[in-house]
């Protein structure tokens, strides 16, 4: 996934802690075992520091996964790593909720907290 797509902008309130939640209910990728499409909802919750994630670039970043054969756990951790690198938040959580396939659903949650 091309993490260089992710753009940020200056946080105009860096001295105030506030939470931003971004939800993408139409995330798609491909199962690396079966080649079948996977559909899920990605929820990103973060407390920005000096910069915030620009949403249009995030949309294009998510599209990078559309044809990628990648496991749920790898997707979730990769998104967290790339977004933390891009915006260096005070804290961030990425949660992926995957639609049922074969009667089984999965949710993966990963978190980051900056060292003080």
Curated annotation (Swiss-Prot):
Quote the Pfam families the UniProt record gives.
QueF
User: What GO terms in the biological process aspect are recorded for it?
Assistant: queuosine biosynthetic process; tRNA modification
Q: Which domain of life is it from?
A: Bacteria
Q: What is its EC number?
A: 1.7.1.13
Q: Where in the cell is it found?
A: Cytoplasm
Tell me where it mainly resides: cytoplasm
Q: Would you tell me the Gene Ontology cellular component terms?
A: cytoplasm
Where substrate binds, per the record, is at 53-55, 72-73
Q: Which residues form the active site?
A: 31 (thioimide intermediate), 38 (proton donor)
Associated pathway: tRNA modification; tRNA-queuosine biosynthesis
The catalysed reaction is: 7-aminomethyl-7-carbaguanine + 2 NADP(+) = 7-cyano-7-deazaguanine + 2 NADPH + 3 H(+)
Q: What class of enzyme is it?
A: oxidoreductase
Q: Which GO terms describe its molecular function?
A: preQ1 synthase activity
Instruction: Print the keywords alphabetically.
Output: Cytoplasm, NADP, Oxidoreductase, Queuosine biosynthesis
* Protein task: Catalyzes the NADPH-dependent reduction of 7-cyano-7-deazaguanine (preQ0) to 7-aminomethyl-7-deazaguanine (preQ1).
Show the NCBIfam families listed in the entry. Answer: QueF-II (TIGR03139)
Family note: Belongs to the GTP cyclohydrolase I family. QueF type 1 subfamily.
Q: What is this protein called?
A: NADPH-dependent 7-cyano-7-deazaguanine reductase
**Phylogenetic lineage:** Bacteria, Pseudomonadati, Chlorobiota, Chlorobiia, Chlorobiales
Gene name, Swiss-Prot/TrEMBL:
queF
């Amino acid at each position: 996934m091309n993490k260089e797509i992710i753009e940020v902008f200056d946080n105009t309130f860096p001295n105030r802690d506030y939470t931003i939640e971004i939800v993408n209910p139409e995330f798609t990728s491909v199962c690396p075992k079966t080649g079948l499409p996977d559909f899920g909802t990605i929820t990103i919750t973060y407390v920005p520091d000096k910069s915030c994630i620009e949403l249009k670039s995030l949309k294009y970043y998510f599209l990078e996964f559309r044809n990628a054969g990648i496991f749920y756990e790898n997707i979730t951790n990769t998104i967290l790593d790339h977004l933390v690198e891009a915006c260096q938040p005070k804290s961030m959580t990425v949660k992926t909720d995957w639609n049922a396939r074969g009667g089984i659903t999965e949710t993966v949650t990963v978190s980051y907290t900056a060292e003080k």
